[in-house]
């Protein structure tokens, strides 16, 4: 069973590295960074506590919101989804991402106090 799992993972990595555009790989690295940051914050919350609760909540909401916005950007700029987003150029999708991220972080900073 482990051999089949390893073969699936190696085939996935080969296809990902060969067929995924550089823009999407960069965005995937950003998504991994946000995911690890959120997991680190949650682990810190479990181990140490949530004394400044607003700060923890703001940071975690920022991670979750940023992850969701980045996934939406990835879906919109993926060349395989070109038919679904005919009226939206990659530049427009990125501008929408920047605008939504700015609003998200303004709300998060307001929540911190």
Curated annotation (Swiss-Prot):
Membrane topology: Multi-pass membrane protein
Cytoplasmic topological segments: 2-30, 74-92
GO cellular component: oligosaccharyltransferase complex; oligosaccharyltransferase complex A; oligosaccharyltransferase complex B
N-acetylserine sites (modified residues): 2
Location of this chain's protein in the cell: Endoplasmic reticulum membrane
BP-aspect Gene Ontology terms: apoptotic process; blastocyst development; negative regulation of apoptotic process; protein glycosylation; protein N-linked glycosylation; protein N-linked glycosylation via asparagine; regulation of protein stability
Quaternary state and interactors: Component of the oligosaccharyltransferase (OST) complex. OST exists in two different complex forms which contain common core subunits RPN1, RPN2, OST48, OST4, DAD1 and TMEM258, either STT3A or STT3B as catalytic subunits, and form-specific accessory subunits. STT3A complex assembly occurs through the formation of 3 subcomplexes. Subcomplex 1 contains RPN1 and TMEM258, subcomplex 2 contains the STT3A-specific subunits STT3A, DC2/OSTC, and KCP2 as well as the core subunit OST4, and subcomplex 3 contains RPN2, DAD1, and OST48.
Species of origin: Sus scrofa
Record's keyword annotation contains Chaperone: no
Keywords: Acetylation, Apoptosis, Endoplasmic reticulum, Membrane, Transmembrane, Transmembrane helix
Keyword Endoplasmic reticulum: yes
Protein family: Belongs to the DAD/OST2 family.
Segments on the Lumenal side according to the record's topology features: 52
Role noted for this protein: Subunit of the oligosaccharyl transferase (OST) complex that catalyzes the initial transfer of a defined glycan (Glc(3)Man(9)GlcNAc(2) in eukaryotes) from the lipid carrier dolichol-pyrophosphate to an asparagine residue within an Asn-X-Ser/Thr consensus motif in nascent polypeptide chains, the first step in protein N-glycosylation. N-glycosylation occurs cotranslationally and the complex associates with the Sec61 complex at the channel-forming translocon complex that mediates protein translocation across the endoplasmic reticulum (ER). All subunits are required for a maximal enzyme activity.
InterPro entries noted in UniProt: DAD/Ost2
Transmembrane parts of this sequence: 31-51, 53-73, 93-113
An annotated Gene Ontology molecular function: enzyme activator activity
Name of the protein in its database record: Dolichyl-diphosphooligosaccharide--protein glycosyltransferase subunit DAD1
Pfam families in UniProt: DAD
Annotated pathway: Protein modification; protein glycosylation
PANTHER family with a match to the protein in the record: DOLICHYL-DIPHOSPHOOLIGOSACCHARIDE--PROTEIN GLYCOSYLTRANSFERASE SUBUNIT DAD1 (PTHR10705:SF0)
